[in-house]
Amino acid sequence: LKEAGLYENSIIVLYGDHYGISNSRNPALAPLINKNSETWSSYDNAMLQRVPYMVVIPGMEKGKIIDTFGGQIDMLPTLEHLLGIDSKNYLQVGQDLLSPQHQQIVAFRSTNNFVTPKYTSYSGRIYNTQTGEEITLPDESTTAELEAIRTAANTQLKMSDAIQTGDLFRFYTGNNLGKVHPDDYNYINSLKALKAIEKEKGDQSTSLYSKRGGVSSV
């Protein structure tokens, strides 16, 4: 980026796609994180689902760690707002992780599995997220809280499934979104298509490729 002259005008985002080791092998990691493999629990497995999300912004002199809970669907809205993009009219899911109104409920695909700052539900067990202590006999108030969180988490998943598997975009008519024809998209010849766009844009192209006179920075 520095050699291409883009570093000072780039936001760099690093995100761990998913955990790297299966639950059956997780206890072997216990000594590395000051845990005991003999007392390893589903809570520990859930905590190892965490992945890094790091953002470097031009001009940022001092970084910090922000403790908030989110998922992959929150990455785009967060980045949009860092760029100053108003996403109110965008058809998308997810929330800005930096927003005070961010609902910190992380839903897992496994049935009734979720994590919030207060509770962790994993493999049929409930834990205090802050201490890792299992909650075996929740009182009436806690049970009501858990049910509300479980409902919200399941709603997230149902909405996502409805959009993707039900192809709900076909019913959306806002923002002049036209019908999408799959045949119009061919990613096999992406380079050829991009060069055609560059040629069509001519002097109006703002890509790095054009600015370098048709020379790649790679």
Give the positions of each predicted feature.
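Solvent-exposed soluble domains appended to multi-pass membrane proteins
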Residues: 1-218
